[in-house]
Amino acid sequence: KRVLFSMVLLMAVSFSFAQTKNVKEAKSIANDVKPNFKQAEQLIGEAMKNPETKDLADTWDVAGFIQRRINEEQMKNAFLKKPYDTLKVYNSILKMYEYYNKCDELAEIPNEKGKVKNKYRKANASSMLAERPNLINGGIQYFNLDKNKEALKFFATYVESASYPMLADKELAKNDTLLPQIAYYATLAADRVGDKDAIIKYAPSALSDKDGGKFAMQLMADAYKAKGDTAAWIKSLEEGILKFPGNDYFFANLV
């Protein structure tokens, strides 16, 4: 039994080492002069699911790095006037946001001594901020293609990223003048796919948008009504009357 236990333990250690090796190899492949991104994504994809590595910040840091490299290679092709995939550029940025944010969450967990050593935040936040406008571009492209579920992901990520702890020092919720407009776009995309919860989630951030605010409030009121939340519906109509007195919709529905 002791020999069998030792063999099982040895296999577990070997498997764990293999997954850690996958993470390092995936990063190395993505960093090649001629990277094989398919192979890199396959390796890191396995590590992102494996119990031994899925809760390690480094795994998600490498996952985000691979997406950043995909974006860089596509942009290099564009600069050299070679064929490039615009949607691949945008989707790599969307995934980069997801992976770097997950990396940051894991890196903020205190170690066994109760200390937080987040070595990833500064560099990853810088990469995310540099590409944040492309979340808008990606959302607009999908919205114009009538692929509203995909558009919603981009607009929603843009809005939600304003509240990411790793970007807190930029105070995006206060300083980003485009935020209300993109929140309105998120509300429109959510309406197109019939996602009432998403409308209710993003519409409040859109109310200060000069052109779309009144429509966001209207869509939010409709969403509450559709969900059968009469109290919230009436409250949103009353708020609409106060915020947008020139819009007859709110008063007409309240009476």
Where are the predicted features?
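Canonical positions in the second alpha-helix
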Residues: A47, C103, Y158, S205-A206, ...
